[in-house]
């Protein structure tokens, strides 16, 4: 389910919210500069509260354009559509797996990875929302959810592990469109816009730290597997 929903919203490419889900995203007004803001969360809005907690977003903040905005909005759509059909534990898992697909994140100042930090937030939400949780069950749940989340995140960026240059380029070429909205206008963008997009891609790939591409948690995948993917 997380794989199906994690790219439902892509504001830059779509020029806003997709029409089929626009009614589910009324909590995000635009500032005059076009940025999106998370409104105050109603106490009875379980789906939005869960997404904000898992993504560590706060009411009133501007959603970060390149650090989880589209993943967060996609998670909100998923949570609102699925909340009446999934258990709380499964809903937490879906939102957490979508959060894990935010790419290219470094360790924080304390040396914690994105999956380490996500695990703490998942554990907190599971303990708060699942009344019969006991410590051993909670840790087993967290380990499974974050391992699954890391697996999904790694599949999402699997093109970076291709050893064949042609396969690598065909897999990563989509990033040019994703990070350069003008190119979404087929036949309209200029040569200058195309050149700028190519140069951005060159700079991005040249500066990307391989250690920030693939994720792991609780030795899944193993250190050796991650090293092989990043080689």
Predicted regions and their residues:
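An active-site-proximal "capping" alpha-helix that borders the catalytic cofactor pocket
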Residues: 67-84
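Divalent metal-dependent phosphate-bond-processing catalytic cores, especially two-metal-ion Mg2+/Mn2+ enzymes
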Residues: 5, 9-16, 20-21, 79-91, ...
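N-terminal, non-catalytic alpha-helical interaction modules of very large eukaryotic scaffold proteins
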Residues: 58-61, 73
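Acidic/His-rich, divalent-metal-binding segments that scaffold phosphate/diphosphate chemistry
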Residues: 1-57, 64
